[in-house]
């Protein structure tokens, strides 16, 4: 789990996301509170529940991007889901409990990677010995049995030195390696994913572990053997227990598009994918026990962050019980022309930086001037105002249109330089931006 302070979390998010300080602060505090809770005594820790967050804001302002970046910072089990993918229990479609099952799978994978990293050094030593055994097979006695190998023999040490220096990387050897188990694909109706997973696991266990002699280069053999030896050093049962503990205490679920499951007042009749899904989410957010293939998982201390544009529906259209379980409300602001300008230049691996790097692979030098960047930002903002406001995603559309000619002819224009200034942008986009009908279809 991340031990970063709220200020450090906000600072890290600022490297990738422009503006939206309120949302960043709320997320940073929620993430830090996970760490604070773990420092409490057991009796008090059980009572401290996470304060779930509802992020409200138009499309393309950074809600999903905050979730993506948070996943990398959290160093904890994290899953992002779309609320529209789920249906009420009893109907065809995914049930909301599959969120926790998927989160547990993520936790098992994360815990497995961490455990493998801890034993990596020892696994590398064991893999090295197996490669040396293949290079220098121990002599056999009269009964055909391999004699005790001499660990410190001069020949073995010479080969060990060469192996570590990479001099033997391309030499081929024959070794016994575990054969990857064949995947058994089972077709099942929607909603039966858990049973399908259990059956697949059963068939794979029946196959058992088999080894096969393979000829491979030493560098590939070392990689395969390190993984094999590391897997032997890891206790799978302990790993599952640790993963479930991680989910229950540090898990974070990000539910996007929650406004799409609001029941609008004028709609009547059965509403499979809306109010029913909200009611199914209630026990998960409030705290319940979900059965997964790794064991039972309690959701009492999992942090839920929901987000939605709420352009048609309002947060008050959510059922009251769900509103009460999302106590922290954060509004994200629409982006201005100045925000667009900052988005184009300030974040790490900004859009302009990406295009410059892509063209450099073709030996084409592209430079964006300050007035050119301002013109791009103004064009994107103007199109958003006159047509549908899709936020920062409009920059992708505008830039693709702007760079279309250079990208297409880049192979023939190697060694040339292009300056993207205000005049260049106006020449390529001016007419499209001015004509509202053209903007609707092209930008």
Swiss-Prot record:
Q: Where is it localised? A: Cytoplasm
Q: Which InterPro entries match?
A: AAA+_ATPase, ATP-dep_Clp_protease_ClpX, ATPase_AAA_core, Clp_ATPase_C, HslU, P-loop_NTPase
Q: GO molecular function of the protein, one example? A: ATP binding
Q: Extract one GO cellular component term from the record.
A: HslUV protease complex
The family line of this record is: Belongs to the ClpX chaperone family. HslU subfamily.
Q: What is said about its interaction partners and assembly?
A: A double ring-shaped homohexamer of HslV is capped on each side by a ring-shaped HslU homohexamer. The assembly of the HslU/HslV complex is dependent on binding of ATP.
What does it do? ATPase subunit of a proteasome-like degradation complex; this subunit has chaperone activity. The binding of ATP and its subsequent hydrolysis by HslU are essential for unfolding of protein substrates subsequently hydrolyzed by HslV. HslU recognizes the N-terminal part of its protein substrates and unfolds these before they are guided to HslV for hydrolysis.
What name does the UniProt record give this protein? ATP-dependent protease ATPase subunit HslU
Please state the gene responsible for encoding this protein: hslU
